[in-house]
């Protein structure tokens, strides 16, 4: 695999990715980047990852029609490169046990200002929808009997809209009542922890506890320390 695929996307390339996706001609229905990020993240949480040839057509078109492509072959190649680099970047993040940093578009008020508080949490809905598509399309997560996986899935799927939550609607309501998410930052942190928990089970990406460093023994009597306490 070329090292170029290991290079994370920069800010301009994230914009380019969105522009190429929206340029997909009709009648095809491509994913939007924030939805796609949930989709890719879920793929990388599966115990058995499908090949790119199996999942990439769904990014270009909701029905995975095989002729879904940009009119310019060079632009199509570029789009596929950006998608795969994003996929590899998420994989590297998970493998290094670092929190994911998903593509999110903040919710804005009628003056174009980002909303705050509980209303801002709606920005993670596309991520949850993309994640949900994968677990409904491929085996390994939704059908899991592992308590850690099932509990962590709720941390993501609780953000599904009420009209698609299905059997989770009652559990979702209980979570919103007992453990409400107060803002977007908290939602992103909760999702990152949930994804890490799933990847720890399905792919063995457990963060290793580092042994405490031994402090050197004092060489002589220590003088009392004055000053403020921190």
Segments the model singles out, each with a brief description of its role:
Residues 1-128, 132-230:
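Domain-length accessory/inserted modules outside core catalytic folds
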């Amino acid at each position: 695999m070329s090292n170029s695929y290991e290079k994370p996307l920069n800010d301009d390339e994230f914009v380019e990715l969105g522009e190429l996706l929206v340029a997909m001609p009709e009648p095809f229905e491509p994913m939007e980047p924030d939805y796609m990020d949930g989709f890719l993240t879920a793929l990388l949480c599966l115990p058995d990852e499908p090949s790119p040839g199996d999942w990439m057509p769904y990014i270009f078109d909701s029905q995975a029609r095989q002729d879904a492509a940009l009119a310019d072959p060079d632009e199509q190649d570029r789009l596929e490169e950006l998608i795969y680099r994003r996929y590899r970047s998420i994989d590297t993040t998970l493998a290094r046990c670092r929190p994911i940093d998903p593509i999110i578009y903040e919710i804005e008020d009628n003056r174009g200002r980002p909303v705050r508080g509980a209303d801002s949490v709606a920005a993670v809905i596309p991520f949850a929808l993309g994640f949900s598509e994968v677990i409904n399309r491929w085996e390994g997560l939704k059908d899991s009997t592992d308590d850690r996986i099932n509990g962590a899935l709720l941390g993501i799927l609780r953000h599904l809209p009420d009209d698609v939550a299905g059997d989770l609607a009652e559990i979702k309501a209980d979570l919103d009542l007992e453990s409400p998410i107060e803002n977007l930052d908290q939602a992103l942190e909760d999702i990152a922890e949930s994804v890490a928990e799933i990847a720890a089970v399905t792919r063995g990406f457990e963060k290793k506890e580092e042994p405490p460093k031994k402090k050197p023994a004092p060489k002589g009597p220590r003088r009392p320390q004055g000053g403020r306490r921190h």
